[in-house]
Swiss-Prot record:
Subcellular location per the Swiss-Prot or TrEMBL entry: Cytoplasm
Cofactor needs: FAD
Organism: Prochlorococcus marinus (strain MIT 9515)
The gene coding this protein: trmFO
Protein name (record): Methylenetetrahydrofolate--tRNA-(uracil-5-)-methyltransferase TrmFO
Residues that bind FAD: 10-15
Amino acid sequence: MLNKEVIVIGAGLAGCEAAWQIANSGVEVKLVEMRPIHSTPAHHTSEFGELVCSNSFGALSTDRAAGLLQEELRTFNSLIINTADEFSVPAGGALAVDRSKFSKSLTQTLSNHPLVEIKRFEQLDLPDKNRITVIATGPLTSNELANKLKNFTGLDSCHFFDAASPIIYGETINYDIAFRASRYDKGDPAYLNCPMNKIDYLNFRNALIEAEQATLKDFEKESANFFEACLPIEEMARRGVDTMRYGPLKSIGLWNPKWGDLFDRENRLKKRPHAIVQLRKEDLKGKLLNMVGFQTNLKWSEQKRIFRMIPGLEKAEFVRFGVMHRNTFLESPKLLLPTLQFLKRENLFAAGQITGTEGYAAAASGGLLAGLNASLLANNKSPVTFPDESMIGALMNFISNKNEIMSQQKKNKFQPMPASFGLVPELNNKIKDKKLRYKAYQKRSLEVLKEFKKVLDSSFEKDHILV
């Protein structure tokens, strides 16, 4: 007989969302978090939902895949997105947050929920078979639990190298050189921009290539397996002279009014920087700034020396240096149903980045689905899948055994996937214009989710407080 209380292992974004959805359905939940008893190479606090990499959830606009995913989460009263909205900071057209206030709020909200019991210890094994459990331990799952999952699934977990960017004290930046602007003047001038001429850029690139890197003690005997969407800046420098310029250091769409008339072609060609380093606010007042796209595994002394070569950052003081760590994820298409239940055990769910979704909103969406389905199972009801036309449904299909591409091409190596319109079904009436097509995807998704939510709500008792 199943114990009605649900166990959620891991209080990251997916775990917090799962616990919230379960508790708000009227089911008791035990939320297990190993920090601060046992920390990780990337975490700095014991707060829930700590953002160890960027502080950005991606584009806000619903005609962008990331923005649509955020809006879908709002439809289901997502704790993660609601909290991100509450503690957002200016970031042009993106949703970025004050990471400290964000994680503290998550911790307080769940700690104060009457149906949530917080337990601080390292989970070393899978809970008993009669316990409904959500595994949301994230990409930094402890070695002990990762080995237990390996034994349970019969498969080795996958991994890649991930890294975090440095954070700088805003007051130590030279604002005579750095200027505020957003690319193409979209939204508020939320980014601080440090322009580089060609000589600056080439010297900077050479320094990155020759710099001494920190040792990854767990991987000294392994070749680097980087996640292409989050490459270390020194790896980009090694890949080619202009790789950084076509990535995080691209200057297109950024202009300082001090340089004169943007629409004077001769002036524009003369004054346009060879490259630009961008910094994004970490807090509302801009006291702390994150170096956008500057994930790195350089030694801290090298980071300080080389990043001070950037014009405007000559006297920069660092709140936090960049670090690299191992990210673990499951080969989910061989293990999970689209409901996020394990094929081998129907009362065991997985959610978040450990399943192979990429991005904060995607992690929350996994927590949302796993939490809803754990609640249904606790009430002796059948788990659900999100509509294929929704971004949540498309992502869950991709990471589950419903992923037809994976089933047909067994040799393909499963890699993490962010929200993408390439995952959703084609429209009945094809639209050539990309912007109009994306808007049509958005309209279709929100319409089907509205109907889906009505059906889902009816699955829960009226006295429950789900969504």
